[in-house]
Curated annotation (Swiss-Prot):
Extent of Basic residues compositional bias: 1-16
GO cellular-component term (any): large ribosomal subunit
Keywords: Ribonucleoprotein, Ribosomal protein
Domain of life of the organism encoding this protein: Bacteria
Name of this protein: Large ribosomal subunit protein bL32
Membership in a protein family: Belongs to the bacterial ribosomal protein bL32 family.
GO molecular function: structural constituent of ribosome
InterPro entries in UniProt: Ribosomal_bL32 (IPR002677), Ribosomal_bL32_bact (IPR044957), Ribosomal_zn-bd (IPR011332)
Chain positions covered by the region annotation Disordered: 1-22
Natural source organism: Aliivibrio salmonicida (strain LFI1238) (Vibrio salmonicida (strain LFI1238))
Membrane-crossing segments per the record: none
One of the protein's GO biological processes: translation
Pfam family, one: Ribosomal_L32p
UniProt-listed SUPFAM superfamilies: Zn-binding ribosomal proteins
Length: 56
């Protein structure tokens, strides 16, 4: 089993944990349909940046 050579300080623990925070999903509203979707992704209706890009 691995054992540390010396105790890690509260500061070092905090610096390590500073990268553990979760980020929220970047959502955007389509100007034509008003639908909420992920940024840089086509909506379910097939619109991207106000233009129809997928014909169903």
């Amino acid at each position: 089993m691995a054992v540390q050579k010396s105790k890690k300080s509260r500061s070092m623990r905090g610096m390590r944990r500073s990268h553990d925070a979760l980020t929220t999903m970047a959502l955007s509203v389509d100007p034509t349909s008003g639908e909420t979707h992920l940024r840089h992704n086509v909506t379910a209706d097939g619109f991207y940046r106000g233009r129809k890009v997928i014909n169903k």
